[in-house]
UniProtKB/Swiss-Prot annotation:
Keywords: Activator, Meiosis, Transcription, Transcription regulation. Coiled coil: none annotated. The keyword Glycoprotein does not apply. Signal peptide: none annotated. The gene is GMC2. The keyword Mitochondrion does not apply. Residues 1-13, 21-31 have a biased composition (Polar residues). Residues 1-31 are annotated as: Disordered. GO terms for cellular component: condensed nuclear chromosome; peroxisome; synaptonemal complex. GO terms for biological process: homologous chromosome pairing at meiosis; homologous recombination; meiotic cell cycle; protein sumoylation; reciprocal meiotic recombination; synaptonemal complex assembly; synaptonemal complex organization. This is Grand meiotic recombination cluster protein 2. Induction: Expression is induced in response to alpha factor and regulated by the UME6 transcription factor. Probable transcriptional activator involved in meiotic prophase and synaptonemal complex (SC) assembly.
Length: 188
């Protein structure tokens, strides 16, 4: 359908007179002038084409124009489908293989389930390996921490013994100094 809308054809009075003269020539001789003949009405209807005038007047509304365009496009698409091997084709369509139609989705679902089971098993193995790794890492950390604490405890015990030794040495030195001072004071 074209984008332009046709302007309704308006006939002037002069055209109507000419049309009436043409219709008068179509009259049969046995019909009187007082009764309008069917030929005359049909001729007027075809010449003036009031149906097209009314239709164009109604189609002035934009919504109706769009609906008319859509209808025209649908008709064209049906024509295209009937001319090709589409749904509207006159040729006999192949019969639907319902067994294949049912088995294909079942096979797809089975394959999907099988793949998901394999993925789940892999995830379980990886999770088990991760748990083992975490446990072994925890054990290693515990051993390292235990070794560090043991080393610190050993160092502190050695330090305490060293300090005790220093304390004993200082007391002995202090006693010697005290005795020496006392001897010096007694000798005088």
């Amino acid at each position: 359908m074209s984008d332009t809308t046709e302007v309704p054809r308006q006939s002037s009075e002069n055209d109507q007179d000419n049309n009436l003269e043409r219709t008068n020539s179509l009259k049969s001789p046995d019909v009187t002038n007082n009764i309008p003949s069917l030929f005359k009405l049909a001729a007027e209807w075809q010449i003036n084409n009031p149906q097209e005038t009314f239709q164009n007047h109604i189609l002035e509304n934009d919504v109706l124009k769009k609906i008319n365009e859509i209808t025209h496009l649908i008709r064209e698409s049906y024509k295209d489908l009937s001319s090709q091997d589409g749904m509207m084709s006159k040729q006999q369509q192949e019969k639907m293989d319902w067994d294949l139609f049912c088995t294909v989705p079942v096979n797809i679902i089975e394959q999907y389930t099988k793949d998901m089971d394999e993925i789940y098993e892999k995830m379980e193995r990886l999770a088990k390996q991760q748990r083992l790794w975490c446990e072994s890492a925890f054990q290693i950390d515990v051993e390292r921490c235990g070794d560090s604490i043991l080393n610190a405890e050993t160092w502190m015990k050695k330090k305490e013994r060293h300090l005790e030794y220093k304390n004993i040495e200082m007391e002995r030195s202090a006693n010697e100094i005290k005795e020496t001072i006392q001897r010096l004071t007694d000798d005088r």
